[in-house]
Amino acid sequence: MLRAAIESLAENFSDAVIAPLFWYLLLGPVGICGYKAVNTLDSMIGHRSDRFLAFGMVAARLDDAANFIPARLSGVLLALAAAFVPAARPFAALATMWRDAAKHRSPNAGWPEAAMAGALDLALAGPRRYHGTLVADPWIGVGRARAELPDLRRALALFVLACVIAAGLIVVALILLLEA
């Protein structure tokens, strides 16, 4: 359960924080509204099932495209945040991200999840039961597969600090734009 919470925290850092900011900075209110519409459609109908195949596939591919850059930025921001979180490993976060991100079934979720796995010395994803069916996903990261409460606390610290770093970078960019 803790491992799943850490995976969700990493993926949602990209989907719920960085991607909306990215699209807002790129296209303003239209960008964030468009992104949230695509992301919500993917959540609602972007499933691999007969029922949603026709429309769901389009929603899923649009979401993949919209998250391509934000997911990679998210991984880098989590690795940067790891430099300031006790016992976190920023270089391992980067190495794990480069090595393992493509192992994830999603073309984007692997980037922040791999960065989180490396930073915390955990193995995320891996074999699991999903709706009663065993899913044999590969492991992301080479650390412990069993996450503990201190790991979740450090994951939360990484999440919060990465949000602060992202906000700081936006402020710096805005100041530079206003001075230009």
Label every PLM stretch briefly.
Residues 1-41, 46-180:
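Hydrophobic alpha-helical transmembrane segments
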